[in-house]
Design a protein with these regions (language model features):
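Glycine-rich beta-alpha junction loops
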Residues: 13-18, 39, 65-67, 79, ...
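Short, solvent-exposed polar/charged micro-motifs at secondary-structure junctions
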Residues: 19-23, 69-74, 133-135, 197-199
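Internal alpha-helical scaffold of NAD(P)-dependent oxidoreductase catalytic cores
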Residues: 3-8, 27-122
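Long, contiguous hydrophobic alpha-helical segments, chiefly transmembrane helices and signal peptides
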Residues: 13-18, 74-78, 82-84, 166, ...
Length: 199
């Protein structure tokens, strides 16, 4: 925003996923979008309301998209490591509670680094990320992802078809961790187990 002060810049994250097959597109669209600007910018809540007014989308206005996207990376990358470990077949992990616990540990390491660097944990529902309740909620979520086609649609399809993007995201978030003196040993171990996929 500081680079382009005359521009009104918004960032958005839509909850949708899918993949292309030879004769069709398989997708899921949860009709939910998180959208907003960087912290400190002029509010766009009214404009966003006008844009999405009359649509079936549930719109979550987020005035701090930088922290939201940092947290998203800290949640998504450990899940991507699981996708790479299994060559995209998350069902191989559906009963591996120990590994899924490590995925959660890596997410917590990421959130801790983000919080300790002075950023907010977003969404706010994740703010108590070191609690047993958070761990149980995440474990249920990851077990569901590994046991159903949701894992393929919402995680492994994207991870397996966006290796360059995931590799860049991993490099960038690790640079952030390093610049802020964060320890992330579980993250690094899962990354190593992801093998040949990450570049």
């Amino acid at each position: 925003a500081a680079v382009l002060p005359e521009k009104n810049i918004l960032f958005a994250f839509a909850l949708s996923a899918g993949h292309r097959e030879p004769d069709r597109v398989v997708s899921i669209d949860l009709k939910k979008i998180t959208i907003g600007q960087l912290r400190g910018a002029v509010s766009n809540a009214e404009l966003i309301g006008e844009i999405f007014g009359g649509t079936k989308y549930k719109v979550v206005y987020e005035p701090n998209m930088e922290d939201y996207l940092l947290c998203h990376a800290a949640f998504v990358m450990p899940a991507a490591f699981a996708c790479y470990k299994t060559d995209g077949d998350l069902k191989k992990l559906r009963r591996n509670t120990v590994y899924l616990g490590r995925v959660i540990d890596a997410n917590i390491e990421g959130y801790r680094a983000i919080r300790n660097a002075g950023h907010d944990i977003l969404p706010k529902a994740d703010a108590d990320f070191e609690s047993e309740k958070y761990r149980k909620t995440c474990l249920r979520f990851f077990k569901l992802m590994c046991a159903t086609s949701l894992g393929k649609l919402c995680a492994s399809d994207h991870a397996m078809n966006a290796i360059d993007e995931m590799s860049a995201l991993n490099r960038d978030i690790k640079r952030f961790f390093d610049e802020n003196g964060a320890a992330y040993p579980v993250w690094q171990a899962l990354e190593a187990e992801a093998g040949r996929y990450l570049r």
